Amino acid sequence: MRFKTRVLLVSLLSLSLVVSGLACGPGRGYGRRRHPKKLTPLAYKQFIPNVAEKTLGASGRYEGKITRNSERFKELTPNYNPDIIFKDEENTGADRLMTQRCKDKLNSLAISVMNQWPGVKLRVTEGWDEDGHHFEESLHYEGRAVDITTSDRDKSKYGTLSRLAVEAGFDWVYYESKAHIHCSVKAENSVAAKSGGCFPGSALVSLSDGGQKAVKDLKPGDKVLAADGEGKLVYSDFIMFTDRDSATRRVFYVIETKEPVEKITLTAAHLLFVLDNSTDDLHSMTAAFASSVRAGQKVMVVDDSGHLKSVIVERIYTEEHQGSFAPVTAHGTIVVDRILASCYAVIEDHSLAHLAFAPVRLHHSVSSALFPQNFISQSNATLQQEGVHWYSKLLYHMGTWLLDSHVLHPLGMSVNSS
């Protein structure tokens, strides 16, 4: 019976994706598909994200040198991609050895390089290092780092190559030298390698009764402050958690505003509504990953008069918190700690994500209308379960099948973790 229910929901999902008129979100321009990003080259000595390489917000801590005789040597896999040139100065094949995550990102980057510059290939000058040529605790010793150039060694391309590496999903990219770009990834077992899109449990939302509640305490029947399709504040039904994890420590981005000083804390792959500094028109706002927001952009803050106001982002930094929660409302938006955010993550297209959850909204509307008391009690029992909701897992897997990998945030979703 459960299988039939899932088939029905998948059918409804497919139907919802072609009914574009069902999309809603703050602002009239909100439903427009985002144009392809313009690649902004990295500057010399710039690194992304703007934190130290071996912090949890980047590639994470050093876990120990791997040698050919160590138990962990089996973690390394050779990369024989014909579209990548390996310098291999040592003639040992060591530069081809890397972790699976590093291999996946490198192969993705190789495709981007050929698309960007026809006839040019990606070139790896350093991969796994077994000879001790790097500084102490270098991620090269674990097969988690590569130094790269283009095959034509055209230094004018290296800034753009750095940006392509960021887009390919490397966890830390550094325009380190005039001679190469340094890229690294998280360890395979890192709990931060897949962070999904969540808020810390202590984040506050506003309720229709005038009170506030921590995100972790939301229950069916709650109406929380959100925004409608015209960018007006409304109280929207809380429907479900797409992810509910009380235990895992994760890295969160903190987006802090200037005058008034407010801050919202969310994971890298979560969507936040932003405006460029040149406009205050709410209809021009778009949804961007938290990790892509920059100081000088604007976010939407609820002012003292109860209206949305665009406020400049002053600084961005990272914090670690235990517990993460991803609430979904009927409008697909939510005001958290006085700042407007999307309920969605992983894919940088709020309208598409909102369409994908149309079957969930339909189920909520019908069930709550026909069986209000039973629906709330049954939903309460379901919501207390830890982990990623099965429907979110389904959407994520469908997204990886149907969408270009560059559309999905590299920190995506850990569908097997809580």
Curated annotation (Swiss-Prot):
Q: Which UniProt keywords apply?
A: Autocatalytic cleavage, Calcium, Cell membrane, Developmental protein, Endoplasmic reticulum, Glycoprotein, Golgi apparatus, Hydrolase, Lipoprotein, Membrane, Metal-binding, Palmitate, Protease, Signal, Transferase, Zinc
Top enzyme class, one word, equals: hydrolase
Site, as annotated: Involved in auto-cleavage: T267
Question: For the lipid attachment Cholesterol glycine ester, which residues are annotated?
Answer: G197
Annotated GO MF terms: calcium ion binding; cholesterol-protein transferase activity; patched binding; peptidase activity
Q: Where is this motif: Cardin-Weintraub?
A: 32-38
| Residues binding Ca(2+) 2, per UniProt | E90, E126, D129, D131
Residues annotated as binding Ca(2+) 1 are E89, E90, D95, T125, E126
| Site entry: Essential for auto-cleavage | H270
Cite the position(s) of the site with description Involved in cholesterol transfer. D243
Highest taxon, organism lineage: Eukaryota
Q: At which residues is glycosylation annotated?
A: N277, N380
- GO BP terms in the entry: animal organ development; cell development; cell fate specification; cell-cell signaling; intein-mediated protein splicing; neuron differentiation; oligodendrocyte differentiation; pattern specification process
Annotated Zn(2+) binding sites: H140, D147, H182
Question: Which residues make up the annotated site Cleavage?
Answer: G197, C198
Q: Where is the lipid attached (N-palmitoyl cysteine)?
A: C24
Q: Which SMART domains match?
A: HintC, HintN
Q: Which PANTHER family does this one have? A: HEDGEHOG, SONIC HEDGEHOG PROTEIN
**This chain belongs to which protein, by name?**
Sonic hedgehog protein
Source organism of the structure: Carassius auratus (Goldfish)
